[in-house]
């Protein structure tokens, strides 16, 4: 190893140690978000998950404009009503958000349950998809179906404001897109985020 490589290695080691110390001193918090009895649409809906962690002094609030996730869980539940139908859930992170909620057609190429991802935004690496799954319900047998998805990777989420509004979204904001094959069924979404308050 050359002297230059040794210095770079030492710098990385020191930076890693400092990061570890800062994270060990940060307060670990837990936030749960529930939206229930929503009617699915064939055009799709994007639900903001992370901007519900508002700035404040409470146990579930953040003190600044950044958190680091330790563990995220998404629970989904669908109920078929009138028709047997499919529900598609896309749980994702917006890597470059600047105070908006992404449109369905920014994530998908078209507002359709069978659509591929939007090639432009994904080529730009705007979104990171955690999970993309379909749940099928039947009004005869499987009236209610559910699924749990987990992300255990540590990820930074930044905020542009204190309140629970789209304008507060920053890079790393997390969302779930829900779209159905029929506009009759209902769904529930619960998100739990365990995070370090940075």
Curated annotation (Swiss-Prot):
This is Coat protein. It is found in: Virion. GO terms for cellular component: viral capsid. Keywords: Capsid protein, Virion. Coiled coil: none annotated. Gene3D superfamilies: 2.60.120.20. InterPro entries: Satellite_CP-like, Satellite_virus_coat, Satellite_virus_coat_sf, Viral_coat. The keyword Hydrolase does not apply. It comes from Satellite tobacco necrosis virus 2. GO terms for molecular function: structural molecule activity. Disulfide bonds: none annotated.
